[in-house]
A protein has these predicted regions:
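Aromatic- and glycine-enriched beta-alpha-beta binding-site module
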Residues: 103-172, 317-386
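An N-terminus-focused feature that recognizes amino-terminal "leader" regions
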Residues: 20-142, 151, 267-325, 329-331
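Generic structural motif recognizing short loop/turn segments at the entrances and edges of beta-strands
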Residues: 67-75, 82, 97-102, 114, ...
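Mixed-charge (acidic/basic) macromolecular-recognition segments
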Residues: 2-3, 12-52, 142-144, 152-285, ...
Length: 480
C-alpha cells in the first residue's frame, strides 16, 4: 500500500521538501503563484486599526515594556569587553567562542565613485540569520506578530521588530541563553505556510558580504501571545513608519519583501530591459575588496575606547556594556560601529503617463557579495563628502525640495545590534523633467515600485536602504 509523504521537522532540517500528495498518494500539482496573496496584504495595509491593539496605544505598550525590563547601555574601554579581545597577530577583534562576528580590516579598489582606493574596518559575520514575521488572519484581515525589542545601538533602545530577529549564534544558543521565541515557525514547515523566504544583504559599507533570511510565514493554528509581542495590521505598521525611530530596520527589510500589487501593470522600461540594464551595471563595475588584518589598516587611530579615522570621518569602532532584561541573555558586552552624523536617503519620484516611478541607482558598496545592488536615488552622509568637490547626483534636488514636493519624511535607525546611534532621514521627493529627466544618466533608471518588489523575490538586488523606503510603500505609509 502506498502512503502519502508527510512533512516532518527532520525532513525539513535535511533540506528536503516533500511533494504535495493527493488521494492514494498521487502527486498533486498546484498553482505556481498565489494571486490572492498581494490582495490580502493590500487589505491589511488598508486597515489602519485592529481590535488587538489600537494604533494610538502602541506608544503606551512600548512604554510599559520599557518599564517592565531594565535597559541600559554604557560605553566602555576595549579592555573591559568580556569575551572579546584583539588577536595578537592580526589585531582583529574577535569573540573567544569564535562565533557571533569579528571586526577585521578591508582593502578596497574600484573603478568608480569619488573614492577609488581606501582601507577601513569591517564587520565580518558569515552566519546567515533569520528575520521573520509570523502573520495570521483575524476577522478576514492579515495581522503581523511584532515584537518590542531592545537593541543596544538604537537611540531609544526599544523599537518594534520582527517576530524573530536572530543570528545563527543566537538561535543555536552560543550565548547559553534562553530560546528564541517563535523560532519554530521559521524552522519547521509544519507550523505554517511560507509566504516569503529570500536572502537579502545588510549594509554594504559596514558588513562584509552579510546576508539574512527575510521570511514571512502564515501560522497554522493558534499562536500563543507573549507580553513582548502584539498583533498589528500592515496599515498600523504603515502609520508607525510615519513616526521617527519606531519600526526597526529588520522589520522594514522583511516588510519590503511582502507581496505587492501591480495596480498599473505598465512601466517605462520592461522587466527584461530592467534586468539587462542591471546586469550591465554589475558587469561594468570592477571592485576588489580584500580582507586584511585590522592592525594593517592605514589611516585609522587606535585608542583605549575607540578606533577612529584620522580625519574624524566615516565611523568609529567602540565598545559597550549592555543590560537588557527582555533578551535571551540579560547582560553582555560587544563592539559597535558608530557612524559620524545623520545620513540622508531618498527616492525621487515621478508619475510617468499616470504610473508612479522611482529613480533607482546602481550602487557599488565594498561589502556586497555581487558588487552592485539597486539603491535609492540619493544615499548620502554629509560629513563623508565635506572635503570632496564631487557631490552625489540629484543631491541638490533633494536638499532644495519645496516642502510641497516631499511625499514622505521620517528618521529611522539602522541595525541596532551592530551600529550605535546610526540614523538616516528617509524621503520620497517628487521631481519633474527639469530635476530628473526620463533619460536618466548612467547608473540610474526609472522603475516602478512593483518592478522593485518583484526583484525582491530574489537575492541581492536591492540594498537595505532601498528596502526601507519600499517598506513604506508596501505598508501604505506613503502613496505615490
Amino acid at each position: 500500500m502506498t502512503t502519502a509523504p508527510t512533512t516532518t521537522a527532520a525532513t525539513i532540517a535535511a533540506g528536503s521538501v516533500p511533494a504535495p500528495a493527493g488521494p492514494a498518494g498521487a502527486v498533486r500539482l498546484r498553482s505556481r503563484l498565489d494571486r490572492e496573496l498581494p490582495h490580502r496584504f493590500a487589505r491589511s495595509a488598508a486597515t489602519p486599526e485592529s481590535s488587538h491593539l489600537r494604533t494610538e496605544d502602541v506608544a503606551g505598550w512600548l512604554d510599559e515594556r520599557r518599564a517592565t525590563h531594565r535597559f541600559q547601555v554604557d560605553r566602555i574601554p576595549f579592555a573591559e569587553l568580556d569575551g572579546w579581545s584583539f588577536q595578537q597577530d592580526t589585531g582583529n577583534l574577535v569573540h573567544r567562542s569564535g562565533r557571533f562576528f569579528t571586526v577585521e580590516g578591508l582593502r578596497v579598489a574600484t573603478t568608480s565613485g569619488p573614492y577609488r582606493q581606501w582601507h577601513q574596518p569591517i564587520i565580518k559575520q558569515p552566519e546567515v540569520g533569520i528575520l521573520g514575521i509570523v502573520v495570521k488572519e483575524f476577522d478576514g484581515v492579515l495581522h503581523l506578530l511584532m515584537q518590542a525589542k531592545m537593541e543596544p545601538g538604537n537611540p531609544n533602545l526599544l523599537q518594534i521588530s520582527p517576530t524573530v530577529q536572530a543570528t545563527r549564534s543566537n538561535y543555536t544558543k552560543a550565548h547559553r541563553g534562553a530560546d528564541v521565541r517563535y523560532l519554530d515557525y521559521f524552522t519547521d514547515r509544519s507550523r505554517g505556510r511560507v509566504l516569503t523566504d529570500v536572502l537579502q544583504s545588510e549594509h554594504g559599507a559596514w558588513f562584509y558580504r552579510k546576508s539574512n533570511r527575510n521570511m514571512i510565514v502564515e501560522a497554522l493554528g493558534e499562536v500563543p501571545l507573549h507580553e513582548d509581542f502584539r498583533w498589528l495590521t500592515l496599515g498600523q505598521v504603515g502609520e508607525l513608519l510615519r513616526r521617527d525611530n519606531v519600526i526597526n530596520m529588520d522589520a522594514r527589510t522583511v516588510l519590503a519583501c511582502a507581496p505587492f500589487s501591480d495596480a498599473e501593470g505598465v512601466a517605462l522600461h520592461s522587466d527584461t530591459e530592467l534586468l539587462s540594464w542591471f546586469t550591465s551595471e554589475r558587469a561594468r563595475h570592477d571592485v576588489e575588496a580584500e580582507l586584511i588584518p585590522l592592525n594593517q589598516v592605514p589611516g585609522w587611530r587606535w585608542g583605549e575606547r575607540s578606533i577612529d579615522h584620522e580625519d574624524g570621518r566615516y565611523f568609529s569602532v567602540v565598545a559597550a556594556s549592555v543590560q537588557a532584561g527582555s533578551r535571551e541573555v540579560s547582560g553582555w558586552t560587544q563592539p559597535l560601529f558608530e557612524p559620524k552624523g545623520l545620513g540622508m536617503t531618498a527616492f525621487l519620484t515621478r508619475r510617468i503617463d499616470g504610473a508612479p516611478h522611482l529613480l533607482a541607482h546602481a550602487r557599488v558598496e565594498a561589502g556586497f557579495k555581487d558588487t552592485v545592488e539597486l539603491g535609492p536615488t540619493v544615499q548620502y552622509t554629509p560629513s563623508n563628502y565635506a572635503h570632496l568637490t564631487e557631490r552625489p547626483l540629484f543631491l541638490d534636488t533633494v536638499l532644495n525640495a519645496d516642502p510641497s514636493r516631499i511625499r514622505y519624511e521620517a528618521v529611522h535607525s539602522e541595525e541596532g545590534g551592530r551600529f550605535l546611534n546610526a540614523e538616516s532621514r528617509y524621503l520620497f521627493v517628487d521631481a519633474d523633467e527639469t530635476d530628473a529627466p526620463l533619460q536618466a544618466p548612467p547608473g540610474y533608471l526609472w522603475v516602478t515600485p512593483y518592478q522593485l518588489t518583484r526583484l525582491l523575490r530574489h537575492n541581492h538586488y536591492l540594498n537595505v536602504q532601498a528596502r526601507t523606503l519600499l517598506s513604506c510603500l508596501t505598508s501604505g505609509a506613503v502613496r505615490l
